[in-house]
Amino acid sequence: MDAVAVSMAEGMQEPNMKPKRSLMLSGTFGFFQFIMPVLGFALVGTVFGFAKVLMKYVSAISTILLLYLSIKMFYSAYLKFRNKETEELQGNLMFQAIGTSVDALSLGFTFSHYSLGRVFLASFIIGIVTFFLCQIGIFIGKKFGTLFSGKADLLGGVILLLVIFLF
């Protein structure tokens, strides 16, 4: 849900998003949702103690990253309100993708009793579903972004805060 919420917020910020950018966003989120459970599975097999400790903090790490993204959106809305240019953060998409897929890493920890083939299949399905849900989120976000043109950053920040507190 958090990758979809971020996709929706991106769509609101950029209502005229080109299909290439939309595919890149959804593809990046889908890829990270695919690779993180595989990575979690690998960590359990090799570094079990570290994985157990990390699992305790997955929720906090994810919350902090999403809170940062929400604050960044509020700041961007403030700059637009003050008629100033917003700065584009390099690597922002990767930061968003990692922040929204940390929970998928912990899912990989629970795959320890599966075969590698089953882990890849389950992770592939998760990645594909994430890709399509993010496409839908971007589409909805673009519609709302057009509707709320000047307030898209503010609304995107509110949506991310809701994700943090509700999920």
Task: Give short role names for the model-derived ranges.
Residues 34-42, 99-113, 161-167:
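Hydrophobic alpha-helical transmembrane segments in multi-pass integral membrane proteins
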Residues 21, 25-29, 33, 37, ...:
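Alpha-helical transmembrane segments of multi-pass membrane proteins, especially transporters
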Residues 21-28, 86-94, 149-158:
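Cytoplasmic-side transmembrane-helix entry/capping segments in multi-pass membrane proteins
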Residues 1-4, 56-65, 119-132:
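Structural signature of hydrophobic alpha-helical transmembrane segments
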Residues 7-21, 71-83, 134-149:
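C-terminal ends of transmembrane helices
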Residues 33, 51-78, 148-167:
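Selective transmembrane alpha-helices of multi-pass membrane proteins
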Residues 1-3, 76-79, 85-99, 124:
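Small-residue-enriched transmembrane helix starts and helix-helix packing motifs
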